[in-house]
Amino acid sequence: MNGFSQQLEDFYPSYFSPSPLGFSEPEVQPVAMNLVPTIQKDIQQQPNRKEVTKIPRASEQSPVQNVRPKEAINTKEADSRNPEPDSSLVSASQRRKRTFFTQAQLDILEQFFQTNMYPDIHHREELARHIYIPESRIQVWFQNRRAKVRRQGAKATKPALASHHYSSTSGAMFPSAPAPNSSSYQMTSSRAQVQPPKEYQLNKFHQSQGFLSYPDSSSDVSRQRFLLSQATPGVYHLPQASSNVYDQNVKSNDPLWGQQQVYTNMESVLNLSRRPQQMPAQPMFMNSFQTNKIIKSKMDTTSPPIPVSTTSSHHSQMSLFAGQDPCHMSTAPGGTYGQISPISDSGVSDTSPEPSSDWEENVSVLLHL
């Protein structure tokens, strides 16, 4: 027993102390022996302290630790490249696919659309079985076809309505605007042809006055008076069918009334020797003016005073020609009167036979008409 305890003390000296209180004395060990176990403990505890206190960097990680993140990254990239198919995405992609119809399918759908524009579910299913197209696609086709019909109808009705509105407004605003080929346009053109303008009528009137013939053999005074009457026809000529009231008004208002009567009567007398049938029907007012008064025309020409003859009372109307020297006038062949007019012919001949009483009587009768 003592031997066994001795062995235990040898193996566990710290638990067996010689003191009576049971406290063992501190064991004194050599310095070299004590340093070795402390160094070993420090070596063993140093990696644990690094792992706890110090966070390793990516460059300081072990190859095993570096492999694991790469594998995780590769798996994430693979997941992003090949995502798992979502049901909503798949259904949306299927709806966006365009349906292509063949010509035979379009003909069948168009033929059915002509008979029925609003097919029900049963008709659509029957068409789907017949042309091998889903019923939903057939429904969409009919919707689009009805919209196309509405667009075409709107385009066809808009121009017609616009033209009707324009015609109604234009008719209300301009009711008398005729078409260029209408009957009113033809009537106005015919009226314009029938009624020439006033300027044309005036020109024609002057031309007709220019064609009037004056006596071939006449005096310079008569020729000058004739030219004056042609230059101003409105002053020296009065209308033949004028009434007495009109003549009186002209007498009172027009200061040249005497000149007008003189030239008018002179013309009628001059034409008497050639064409008695052209004598005017209006009576000549020979006594309405003074014979001894000097007459001034617009061309500042004066005529000598005409002396009044008192030889006979019935020859008072021919007093204009009593003081003038009669001269010979050549008569045209085939003239009405063979006798010679008492009007002078610019002094060509100094002597002329006396006028006969028959000629004077004819002149007086015509003057008294």
UniProtKB/Swiss-Prot annotation:
Residues 94-153 bind DNA. Its main location: nucleus. It comes from the Eukaryota. It is found in: Nucleus. Residues 179-193, 338-355 have a biased composition (Polar residues). GO terms for molecular function: DNA-binding transcription factor activity, RNA polymerase II-specific; RNA polymerase II transcription regulatory region sequence-specific DNA binding. One of its GO terms (cellular component) is nucleus. GO terms for biological process: regulation of transcription by RNA polymerase II. Keywords: Developmental protein, DNA-binding, Homeobox, Nucleus. Residues 68-84 have a biased composition (Basic and acidic residues). Gene3D superfamilies: Homeodomain-like. Induction: By activin and TGF-beta1 (immediate early response gene). InterPro entries: HD, Homeobox_CS, Homeobox_regulator, Homeodomain-like_sf. Residues 39-94, 153-194, 324-362 are annotated as: Disordered. Signal peptide: none annotated. May be a transcription factor which play a regulatory role in the development of the embryo. Belongs to the paired homeobox family. This is Homeobox protein Mix.2. The lineage of its organism: Eukaryota, Metazoa, Chordata, Craniata, Vertebrata. The gene is mix-b.
